[in-house]
């Protein structure tokens, strides 16, 4: 996909870098696969802020994505590739031989007109979904299930991929982009290849307003606050933190481990920061 630097006709356009995909569908999404999506503004049911820096932004409709890929043995033709405002990856509209249509995460290199297949008998080709027990070791995969039949939960963002390192018994070892090596049951499904739109990270929004369009509000530095609002706050004039950098609630902000899910600790062979000392 070509990367376009916008002509600097104004200060807000000067730094804009766009990733242009001429193959994207320019019309509306498939109506049967679209649902209403309510914006929370980062608030919970009590109206309290639970996630900071959320609010505003353009209204979105949610596209129903098939993360299970459970229509085995039925060929599906890629009708079109679409933009999805809810994720960094593009999505592909599949039309199955029985007439049903479903959205999937668009894999890298899959074009309009390609025929994809799901199931244990599917060939090893980008976009095909198989149980991990049927995928050769060394294959690059994405959209990986964490529990058989639950649907893909890992490796779904633009340009993401994982490497199938080994299989032993009922578990397979996957190396994720973060460096983490994780065990996954061999009956979990994964899609062959990488996620498309891999140049997403090269774009530049160019101005603060473009971030606001995405529903992201400004982040205020702790040192600019009062001491009642943040541990870094207060002082006369411009001052530093005066301590180890922390969150507004006192949690160390630099390199502190926050993983608390002990139930799945035994599924992690090597943690992502094992080489950081």
UniProtKB/Swiss-Prot annotation:
Stretch list, region Disordered: 37-59, 221-265
The keyword DNA-binding belongs to this UniProt entry's keyword annotation: no
Composition bias, Basic residues: 50-59
Gene of this entry: rplB
Organism: Chromobacterium violaceum (strain ATCC 12472 / DSM 30191 / JCM 1249 / CCUG 213 / NBRC 12614 / NCIMB 9131 / NCTC 9757 / MK)
Keywords of the record: Ribonucleoprotein, Ribosomal protein, RNA-binding, rRNA-binding
Signal peptide feature range: none
Entry superkingdom: Bacteria
Protein's recorded name: Large ribosomal subunit protein uL2
MF (Gene Ontology): rRNA binding; structural constituent of ribosome; transferase activity
